[in-house]
C-alpha cells in the first residue's frame, strides 16, 4: 500500500480554557500554520513525550532568560572594573607634586585624553558580541564541540570517534541503515512530505552497513551541513514500517530514545502522532495510525462539531477501512477524539444540501450511507470500537455491526430517530430487536430512550465497560493482545459468527436507505429535520 506519513511537528503553545483544563496548540507536519488546532491534554495521551519536551523547553527558556540577565550584570561589572583600573593607572602615571607651569599642564591634559581613549576602547571590546562570548566562557562551561569532523568523503562527512564524556552526557539514538534506501530528513520543512523525493538523499555505499549509535546533537547539527542525512531506519523513513507513540515509550523502526534530552529540534521530531494517507491524499476528519498488528482509525472531525457524520467524513472512514482491509493489519480499532464518540448525522449539513435539489441530493447522500454501512457488514477483519463518550443516532446503530465494543463508563447511547424526523439507519431495525428484544428496541428507536454504558452492556450493545481513569490503557492492553493472535483465526472466527446474518443485514440496509431517500426527497422530511436543527439543545 503506497502511503505517506504526516505527524505532529511541534507543540506550539499552551493555555487554560474557561474550565481550567489544559490545552495545547498542535502543529501538524505537512500543514500550514492556519491548520494548527487546540487539543485537550487527554487527546495527547499517546504523545506524552512531545508534551514533556514542550514543557521542558518552556522551563529552559526561563533559565536562559535568567542567564542572559546574569551575563548583562557581569558585563556592566566588567566595564566598571575596567574603568576603575584605567583611573588607577592614570593616577600612578600622573605627577604627584603640584606643577604650575604650562608645560606640565599640557602633559597632564595629554595623559587625561589618553586615559579617555583607553576607556572607549575597553567599552567597545566589552560591547562586541564575539569578545563577550570569550568573557562569558569564564563563568560558564562551554558546550562540547560537535563530534563531526569537517572532512568529507564523496560529499558526505565522516564520523570521528566521539568523546566518551560528551557521549555520556547526550541522548543516544540507535540507528541502522540499509544500502540503497532513500531516507527522508525529518528536519525538513513541513511541506516536504508532499513533494515526492525532492528532499530524500541517497545513502552512500561507504555508509551502507553502519550500525551503532550517534548522539542527538550530531543528528541536529547535520541538518546545517550539505551532504548529511539523519541516520534512521530507512524502512521507517519510507513509511513501510509500523510506528506509534503509545505510552510510555516511543516506537519507530530501529530507533530508541533515552529520556534526558537537551537537543529539542531533533527530539521533538521523534515523538509524534502519525497521519497516514493513501495516494498522497490527506485525511481531514479522521486520523489513521498504523500500529503493530492493527490499524487505529480515530474520528476527529474538523468540518463538523462533536464528530458528526457528513458525506465527506463518511467517505474518509470508508477509504480508511478499505485500506486496512488490503494491508497486513490483523484488525481495526475504531475510536474518537474528544468527549463525544459520535453524535450521528450532521443534519445541518444535510438540510443545506437537500434544499438545493432534493431528489439528486437525497439519492447521493443515501448511496453514501448505504456504502458506509455495507463496508462494515462486509469487512472481513475484526473491528473493535472504543466508545469514549456519547454515541447517538448512526454513531450508535453501527455498533452491532462491529465485533467488540468497549465503552467508557461515562458513555451513553441514544437513537432518537423520531426526534430527528427520520427513520432508523445502520441496520438498527434488525440488529436492535435481535440483540435486546423488540420491547427495548422500540424504546430506543421510537421513544428515543437513553442507555447508560452499564445498561447498554446488560442489553448486549456493549461488550465491556471500563473505568474512566484507566479506559485508554485498558483498551490498548487488550487490543495489543488481540493483535498478537493468528490473523487467519481471527478472520475465520468472525466469518463463522456473521455467515448466517450477512445477507439479512445487507437487505435491511437496502430497505432502510430506501425509506431514508423517500423522507429526504419530500418537503415534509426536510421540514422535520430543519425543525430539529433549529430547536435542538446542546446536551454535551
Curated annotation (Swiss-Prot):
Keyword entries, A-Z: Acyltransferase, Nucleus, Transferase
Protein name: Testis-specific chromodomain protein Y 1
One Pfam family matching this protein: ECH_1
UniProt-annotated location(s): Nucleus
Chief site of localization: nucleus
Primary role: Has histone acetyltransferase activity, with a preference for histone H4.
EC number of this enzyme: 2.3.1.48
Superkingdom in the source lineage: Eukaryota
Gene: CDY1
PANTHER family, alphabetized: PTHR43684, TESTIS-SPECIFIC CHROMODOMAIN PROTEIN Y 1-RELATED (PTHR43684:SF6)
Complexes and interactors: Interacts (via chromo domain) with histone H3K9me3.
Entry-linked SUPFAM superfamilies: Chromo domain-like (SSF54160), ClpP/crotonase (SSF52096)
TM spans (from-to): none
Keyword Cell cycle: no
Domain Chromo span(s) in chain numbering: 6-66
MF-aspect GO terms: histone acetyltransferase activity; histone H3K27me3 reader activity; histone H3K9me2/3 reader activity; transcription corepressor activity
Single biological process term from Gene Ontology: spermatogenesis
Biased composition (Polar residues): 87-97
Tissue-wise expression: Testis-specific. Detected in spermatids (at protein level).
Residue ranges, annotated region (Disordered): 76-106
Enzyme class label: transferase
GO cellular component: nucleus
Catalyzed reaction equations: L-lysyl-[protein] + acetyl-CoA = N(6)-acetyl-L-lysyl-[protein] + CoA + H(+)
